[in-house]
Amino acid sequence: MAILMLSLQLILLLIPSISHEAHKTSLSSWKHDQDWANVSNMTFSNGKLRVKGIYYRNADICSRHRVTSAGLTLQDLQLWCNLRSVARGQIPSTL
């Protein structure tokens, strides 16, 4: 979920000051060489960012660390987020 929120914050930073009227952006992609997502079919209206056809229903956030290490640091922890995406009108499948 943190990755998704960070992505949305980056998208909002890339959109120049937008009034509360409906606008469409012409963003196509950013930082593709650093695994950032491509952006298409997006609208921003009344403070809401909408992406047609993709909705995130469930997110599982997990963490893992080495059991044998005595003094854990942040570098020893691993955090990942599993997102299940479904198109409009479909039932999400399990991971």
Curated annotation (Swiss-Prot):
Q: Spell out the SUPFAM superfamilies in the cross-references.
A: TNF-like
Single GO MF descriptor: cytokine activity
Location(s), subcellular: Secreted
Q: An example of a Gene Ontology BP annotation on this entry?
A: positive regulation of canonical NF-kappaB signal transduction
Q: Extract the InterPro entries matched here.
A: Tumour_necrosis_fac-like_dom
Q: Which region is the signal sequence?
A: 1-19
Q: Which sites carry carbohydrate?
A: N38, N41
Q: Which UniProt keywords apply?
A: Glycoprotein, Secreted, Signal
Q: Which GO terms describe its cellular component?
A: extracellular space
- In the UniProt record, does the keyword Membrane occur? no
Q: What is this protein called?
A: Putative uncharacterized protein UNQ5830/PRO19650/PRO19816
